[in-house]
Amino acid sequence: MEIKDGFIIINKEKGYTSHDCVQQIRKLLGTKKVGHTGTLDPGVTGTLPIAIGSATRFIQYLPQGKTYIGQIQLGIRTKTDDIQGEIINKKEWPILSNAQLDKFLNKFRGIIQQIPPKVSSVHVNGERAYKKFFKNEEFELKPREVKIEELVLKKWDQINGILEIKISCSTGTYIRSIARDLGGVLDSEGCLLNLKRISACGFHEKNSIKISDLVNLNKNCSTFIIPTIYALDHISTLILNNQEEINFWETGRLIKLDEENLIKSSKFDYKKPIKIINNQKMLLGIGFINEDKNKLHPKLVLNAK
């Protein structure tokens, strides 16, 4: 089977770990060079982009935002901040209208400080927090800054204390923490009931496929690989027009921009990455222009010599 470089967008089902999905793709495609773009907890479903081949080198250049649909259960606190965890407290939730509840959600919009759940992949003294948790070790996690781009109250079941939210957030945001902390600001408790990621790193649920469906496709599963260049549409582009420039690029040397690229680069932010392609629109890698915007520095070079 021909192995392509690019991304397969998995619609992860409950019970699978992100690593399970990576291992299955490795097995199906017969390649070890496979990696995911960010862990989804086993109980969380939805969009999990998986990079294949040289695409693994471009993960850091993908859009970092993620969007979820989640249900929060008020009145219950658990050790893991989700409904699967051991219950440690129960407390009545307040009677609120949709508008009143939405005002409380304002505390979680924009840039906020958030303490991750103890069952998380955050490092504590060189070890993952979840490993310490399952060894019953005592430890504390420090607040971290995260950004909530959008937080929409979609439904509010006042009788059962369940609200549904849509949330777009930065990498590193824990929705379980929002569930827990919302319970706190309501003078109640809270935990995450269900969570589905509908988009991540510029990829969307509508383009995803379940692992079980990929397995059924067997040798045809490579047709679902999205070429890396399409995943970088959000990045500005420069075209290397001649072989001399390409030779300089492939050997990692500084390239003096020609007149056409000088005009283009004048509009670029020199601190941001640039997608480099050739005349055939083939991806060559990622570069940065200098502060004077007249030279190109190779940063990530495909087919380096």
Curated annotation (Swiss-Prot):
The keyword Isomerase applies. It comes from the Bacteria. Transmembrane segments: none annotated. The keyword Isomerase applies. Keywords: Isomerase, tRNA processing. The active site is at D41 (nucleophile). It catalyses: uridine(55) in tRNA = pseudouridine(55) in tRNA. InterPro entries: PsdUridine_synth_cat_dom_sf, PsdUridine_synth_N, tRNA_psdUridine_synth_TruB. One of its GO terms (molecular function) is tRNA pseudouridine(55) synthase activity. Its EC number is 5.4.99.25. GO terms for biological process: mRNA pseudouridine synthesis; tRNA pseudouridine synthesis. Responsible for synthesis of pseudouridine from uracil-55 in the psi GC loop of transfer RNAs. Belongs to the pseudouridine synthase TruB family. Type 1 subfamily. PANTHER family: PSEUDOURIDYLATE SYNTHASE TRUB1 (PTHR13767:SF2), TRNA-PSEUDOURIDINE SYNTHASE (PTHR13767). This is tRNA pseudouridine synthase B. It comes from Prochlorococcus marinus (strain MIT 9515). The lineage of its organism: Bacteria, Bacillati, Cyanobacteriota, Cyanophyceae, Synechococcales.
